[in-house]
Amino acid sequence: MTEKNQDAVTEEQGTEVVLQIQRIYVKDVSFEAPNLPHIFQQEWKPKLDFNLSTETTHLAEDLYEVCLNISVETTMEGSEDVAFICEVKQAGIFAISGLEDVQLAHCLTSQCPNMLFPYARELISSLVNRGTFPALNLAPVNFDALFVEYMQRQQAQEESKTEEKEKKEVH
């Protein structure tokens, strides 16, 4: 196939989708163990509180920063004693083109965080290990399911706003 034919195929099929990692980095990290050393004298029965969020920033044309924010707070079951708090902001710069609207939102809130999560999980595991706590292996996160849930919430909010507006117009 000649170069002209390849360009024509790309134009016929639509815009070529590009997703490239430009850089992955740690934006912020914090590890606190406020109740050391007496926490080690207690029986290890942890209660884990895991929070996750993402932030996206449009840096330039087709260039985005995605930041995965993870907070893990572990308290001892049956008490208020905090064993440790670990917070990580794992970020990446991604070149993304050929996507618009919902597809771009899906890429930024699902595919990019999927690429960042293993780095954040390893960093958290390492920090917990350096605090000499038992191993912490965070389970994989289904970012696709989180995106679908988010879109359903957005749609429900839009529908309720429309219904409220219609009720006000009737009265």
From Swiss-Prot:
Coiled coil: none annotated. Gene3D superfamilies: SecB-like (3.10.420.10). It comes from the Bacteria. The keyword Cytoplasm applies. CDD domains: Translocase_SecB (cd00557). Signal peptide: none annotated. Keywords: Chaperone, Cytoplasm, Protein transport, Translocation, Transport. GO terms for biological process: protein folding; protein tetramerization; protein transport. GO terms for molecular function: unfolded protein binding. The keyword RNA-binding does not apply. Transmembrane segments: none annotated. GO terms for cellular component: cytoplasm. Its main location: cytoplasm. It is found in: Cytoplasm. One of the proteins required for the normal export of preproteins out of the cell cytoplasm. It is a molecular chaperone that binds to a subset of precursor proteins, maintaining them in a translocation-competent state. It also specifically binds to its receptor SecA. Belongs to the SecB family. Homotetramer, a dimer of dimers. One homotetramer interacts with 1 SecA dimer. This is Protein-export protein SecB. The lineage of its organism: Bacteria, Pseudomonadati, Pseudomonadota, Gammaproteobacteria, Pasteurellales.
